[in-house]
Amino acid sequence: KSCCKNTLGRNCYNTCRFIKKPRKTCAGLCGCKIS
């Protein structure tokens, strides 16, 4: 489960995951935490 600060972060994370990037990478890029 990803925890993003806001909707923008979540959208960023989801887009990043959609293009098959690792969760950790996406979380870092988008300012999200992996719980």
Curated annotation (Swiss-Prot):
GO MF entry, a single one: toxin activity
Cell location: Secreted
Keyword list, A-Z: Antibiotic, Antimicrobial, Cytolysis, Disulfide bond, Fungicide, Plant defense, Secreted, Toxin
Entries under SUPFAM superfamilies matching the protein: Crambin-like
Cystine connections: C4-C32, C12-C30, C16-C26
One annotated Gene Ontology cellular component of this protein: extracellular region
GO biological process, one term: symbiont-mediated cytolysis of host cell
Maturation and modification: Contains 4 disulfide bonds.
InterPro entries found in the cross-reference section: Thionin, Thionin-like_sf
Function: Antimicrobial peptide disrupting membranes. Has antibacterial against Gram-positive bacteria S.aureus (MIC=6.5 uM) and B.subtilis (MIC=3.25 uM) but not against Gram-negative bacterium E.coli. Has antifungal activity against C.albicans (MIC=3.25 uM).
Family per similarity comment: Belongs to the plant thionin (TC 1.C.44) family.
Protein name: Thionin NsW2
Species assigned in the record: Nigella sativa (Black cumin)
